[in-house]
Amino acid sequence: MLKNNKEILSVLFDLDGTLADTSQDMCDSLNRILDLRNLKQVDCVNLRKYISRGAIGVIEYASVVNGKSIDSSLLRSEFLEDYKNNCFIKTTLNKDMDQLLDYLLSEQIKIGVVTNKHSRYVNKIIKGLGIEKDLSCVVTGDMVLNAKPASDSLMKAAEIIQCPT
């Protein structure tokens, strides 16, 4: 797979959309909350492009779909509570990711996850995916002062896995 990998000591993955497809569980949680408020559901495929912006991004998309401003503070807390209980129903590793992880481990390359998502969700997802023992580090949004794209989480991951920066 990798030709000259002597220089590669570790690989860090983002969680949502890179390592795993979490979009269906996020969409289902959002749609349950929208249903409770008699609002239109969102299309899960279209929602994917908003997921990188977290709960606020998906709620903004719901506002667009519904053609009106939605009270994001209330909806956000309801959405996050539902998602906490349903964050690993349909979530899966992305296509061929299991093979890539196996390969990296066979080459003794450390693997880590760096995400803006809160640890209360990430821990359940990582455990559900069955990869918690394969990871040298997991850095979540609540572990750093400044979320990505700031470098705080990447620097923390490098420190944890003792990777030269």
PLM regions: where:
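N-terminal helical cap/lid subdomain that shapes the substrate entry/recognition surface
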Residues: L2-Q99, Y103, E107, R120
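Hydrophobic "anchor" residues on beta-strands that sit immediately upstream
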Residues: S10-L12, G112, C137
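Substrate-recognition "cap/lid" segment bordering the active-site pocket of phosphatases
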Residues: I89-K90, H118-T165
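Short active-site oxyanion
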Residues: Q108-G112, T165
